[in-house]
């Protein structure tokens, strides 16, 4: 019986997601054992600055990918939105389980909705994507950076001077906290989700054919197609955490992919948005990127990157 070593970050959410996925594999009743190996990533250690200033997306996966390449672990369970657009040679996303709610969750101290927040209220987020879109809707708000895992951020909302914070609905759902803490779900038209938000990425080595066969049982074809379109868009624009960038795709009734893609200025004064429909994930992602580039997306990305230096 093969023992599969599964790498995970040490946070409660990461371990919850990892154990949930292992349970799906165990339920198949196939002859495998599983062991979780906890790995500390740079993103878990550096909590005093925003992600955009310390290297963006790769912060939560680099150490785990190193463990995959050196065969310390066999696979890893990531939040798809933490995955860089390009993976190291020899690694691949071997499985995308069914996506859960991709929306952002608005959590206010007083119970006021986003529209009801007092003028000048303090909104906590560490995401340029969220801050740009929400400032576009409410330029009167003040954005104050907030870092840490879910429970840390919820505690900071209670104890510090934040009036509201924004978190991913999916993480709260996976922790079983969504009903008790979420004030409202932000509609995708108000705040387009991050690329891959609500989805998991199961990363493994390309040459591990045995494991890839096992993972195929849990793969969700719709999630795989829609997230692929989002990630092609992200790759073409070379967007990471340093830029207000968003992309969310769904499947239409005719089985086509509909991708809404967005790039914004840091302060939300400019939001470029395009919706593309098509059947091929790669073509849809590239078309969305090309349309936004024609609108001036590259200039916004350059300006955002300069602002981070």
UniProtKB/Swiss-Prot annotation:
Q: Cofactor note, please?
A: Binds 1 dipyrromethane group covalently.
Q: List the disulfide bonds.
A: none
**Which biological process annotations from GO are given for this protein?**
protoporphyrinogen IX biosynthetic process
The pathway entry for this protein reads as: Porphyrin-containing compound metabolism; protoporphyrin-IX biosynthesis; coproporphyrinogen-III from 5-aminolevulinate: step 2/4
Question: Which GO molecular-function terms appear in the entry?
Answer: hydroxymethylbilane synthase activity
**Keywords of this protein's UniProt record, alphabetized?**
Porphyrin biosynthesis, Transferase
Q: What is its EC number?
A: 2.5.1.61
Q: Which cofactor does it need?
A: dipyrromethane
Name any GO cellular component annotation.
cytoplasm
Report the catalytic activity: 4 porphobilinogen + H2O = hydroxymethylbilane + 4 NH4(+)
Query: From what superkingdom does this record's organism come?
Result: Bacteria
Task: Tell me the residues on which S-(dipyrrolylmethanemethyl)cysteine occurs.
Answer: 241
PROSITE patterns reported in the protein's UniProt record = PORPHOBILINOGEN_DEAM
* Protein role: Tetrapolymerization of the monopyrrole PBG into the hydroxymethylbilane pre-uroporphyrinogen in several discrete steps.
Name the protein family: Belongs to the HMBS family.
Give the quaternary structure: Monomer.
PANTHER family for the chain? PORPHOBILINOGEN DEAMINASE
Q: Which HAMAP family match?
A: Porphobil_deam (MF_00260)
- From the Swiss-Prot or TrEMBL record, give the protein name: Porphobilinogen deaminase
